[in-house]
Amino acid sequence: MGVVYGSQQNLSEYFYSSVNMAEVPDTFEENRGHSFEGVTLQRRHVKGMKSYGSDITPRRPKQLGLPKEVNTSECIDQGSWRKPSAFESLRSYSRKFSKRIFSFIGVESKSTVQRNASGADSTSLSHFTANEINKGNCKKTALSNEFNSANKGSKASGVGAELPSVNGFIEGELHDDNETDSFRINELAKQIQETSLGATTQEDESSDGICWDELSTTSPESSKVSEPIIQDNTQTTHINNDSSDIRFSSRCDLFADDADSDWEQDFNVKFDSPLIIPETVNSAGHTVREQLFEVKEFTRSIKDLKDLYEKANSKDIYDKDSEILGEAKAILRLADPANYSDLKDEDAQNILSKYKVKLEGDSSLDFDASMLPGLNDHVHYLMSQLQLLLH
């Protein structure tokens, strides 16, 4: 079978059946090996086909060539030599139109940003955006008129059977593009106006880097805070004047304070900068801290001893005149300044002499800080003995 290869549309549908190459016309032999604008005719030797002893008469193909007026640059598909259809031409126009729209949007946004950066007011920006929108609408109407004229010309040329649907598609697309583009332009105008208004309000509210709103809101609070500071200073000076006689205050309020009060907090001072403390002061501070701890521990132990003493004194099975109960009673009197007048009994005198506590008259005791550890140990011993008696 001999096949003539040509363009995809014109020459592919012709074939030869049972062709004798000797009987091919001279025109085919002359054209063999020559090209028609890129299309080459080739020859292939195949066996002749017979049908029950009778040869089939050969057919001469139609001499079809490519039209010389076709411009290959106008064709959309590279492998096709046909003219572009009306839809393809309108599609190319629509692409050009969309490119113009996007280029217009980019120019408009750049110009508005530059005007905002230069400090243009909101009124000029609004006029500018309105003018740009009007220009864009004029351009869009001109382009739509151009599309309509192209559609009318294509209808008059005889290929208008396809155009109603294509024209409707293009008009709908243009309508949607117009709506979306106008919406985008309006949104850009709103954003520019908001940014310009925000910048002007910030410049009005603040001058020379000072925010007057913050000063107006914080100044009353600062004035309110300054008053308690002055009051605290007066209170501290008043307390210092009252606590000039440290010995007297320690005698009267040594055991009357609450047990939960953290007395050593006054000595836990935090200081960020490096501070050189003399060794004597440091050792004295440790000594005072230890003594305060002993006072706090003695106050807690006295409360527990008082509870155990009341339980043991309420029961008749134990001798109330025993040595343990007497010492516990003397320690409780020693811890309460209101009972200093009752320390003249034998048990109280024994404890005072044992721990070298001096009784000055009937109203005060001369306590030494060095005796607090011994008093704490004795209180713990009495508590253990009372627990044994109760159990």
UniProtKB/Swiss-Prot annotation:
GO terms for cellular component: cell cortex of cell tip; cell division site; cell tip; cytoplasm; cytosol; division septum; medial cortex. The keyword Cell cycle applies. Keywords: Cell cycle, Cell division. GO terms for biological process: positive regulation of mitotic actomyosin contractile ring contraction; positive regulation of primary cell septum biogenesis; positive regulation of septation initiation signaling; regulation of mitotic cytokinesis; septation initiation signaling. GO terms for molecular function: GTPase activator activity. InterPro entries: Etd1 (IPR045342). Residues 49-68 are annotated as: Disordered. Involved in septation. This is Septation protein etd1. The gene is etd1.
